[in-house]
Amino acid sequence: MNITAVIPARFASVRFPGKALAIIDGKPMIQHVYERTARASLVDSVIIATDDERIQQAVSVFGGVCRMTRNDHETGTDRLAEVAGTLSADIIVNVQGDEPLIAPEMIDQAIRPLLDDPSLRMATLKSRIRCLHDFLSPNVVKVVTDRDGNALYFSRSPLPFFRDKWQDLKDESFASGKLLCYKHVGLYVYRRDFLVEFAAMAPTFLETSEKLEQLRALENGARIRVVETEFESIGVDTPDDLVKARERFRAIQSK
């Protein structure tokens, strides 16, 4: 069983161009992601997938493995699938290139369900929502699951809708666990053959409505196992997020 992690990385990010090469604690962000991914105990190899020579050059400098891809991909999944189609790996892990504090344990947590259940083709992560802002924010994707941990739905809207408590929602309700709900953590694990199949599927109604690719899998009847993680990461989507990531690195070093 070979497990390969692929980190899609673009230079031309809409909200933060060049963020993959933004320096955090003396290293480009993409290097932090690469090194943390390589420390996952279940991952055999790590590849960065990019269409930009500047990122390729940076990866070469720190000794990472990089694959150049086409520059017409609309999504990171499409870029991932192009690379996956050239690999002999059994399982492909999609690690976001803008999560410099991702814990290696998170990656192992997401992989394990596919090792335990041969019929499972896709898995991802969730973590507790602990404040009202995250519950209401369309930038925080919510997820609900069945009793076996399989995804029922992902949404940018509040999910579930607490009808009888809506007027009384406050931070304490979430922090205390009185209202238990979850946000999606965008790390995906696929069986390689399913990833190639998934990328070839036509976009679906719910996917295009919510702008969430994973809904394409649900609408086509795929089962997605969602594992709860206690680890927290920081996604760097804006320059403000970069400031927060740098502060977190400094805090870790000062301990």
Swiss-Prot record:
Any one GO molecular-function label of the UniProt entry: 3-deoxy-manno-octulosonate cytidylyltransferase activity
Task: Reply yes or no: does the keyword Transferase apply.
Answer: yes
Could you tell me what reaction this enzyme catalyses?
A: 3-deoxy-alpha-D-manno-oct-2-ulosonate + CTP = CMP-3-deoxy-beta-D-manno-octulosonate + diphosphate
Recorded E.C. number(s)? 2.7.7.38
* GO CC annotations, alphabetized: cytosol
Q: Which InterPro entries match?
A: Cytidylyl_trans, KdsB, Nucleotide-diphossugar_trans
Write down the superkingdom of origin: Bacteria
Q: In which pathway does it act?
A: Nucleotide-sugar biosynthesis; CMP-3-deoxy-D-manno-octulosonate biosynthesis; CMP-3-deoxy-D-manno-octulosonate from 3-deoxy-D-manno-octulosonate and CTP: step 1/1; Bacterial outer membrane biogenesis; lipopolysaccharide biosynthesis
Places the protein is found = Cytoplasm
Q: Which UniProt keywords apply?
A: Cytoplasm, Lipopolysaccharide biosynthesis, Nucleotidyltransferase, Transferase
Keyword Endoplasmic reticulum part of the UniProt annotation: no
Q: Which GO terms describe its biological process?
A: CMP-keto-3-deoxy-D-manno-octulosonic acid biosynthetic process; lipopolysaccharide biosynthetic process
What is this protein's function?
A: Activates KDO (a required 8-carbon sugar) for incorporation into bacterial lipopolysaccharide in Gram-negative bacteria.
Q: Which PANTHER family match?
A: 3-DEOXY-MANNO-OCTULOSONATE CYTIDYLYLTRANSFERASE, 3-DEOXY-MANNO-OCTULOSONATE CYTIDYLYLTRANSFERASE, MITOCHONDRIAL
Which family, according to UniProt?
A: Belongs to the KdsB family.
This chain's protein is named 3-deoxy-manno-octulosonate cytidylyltransferase
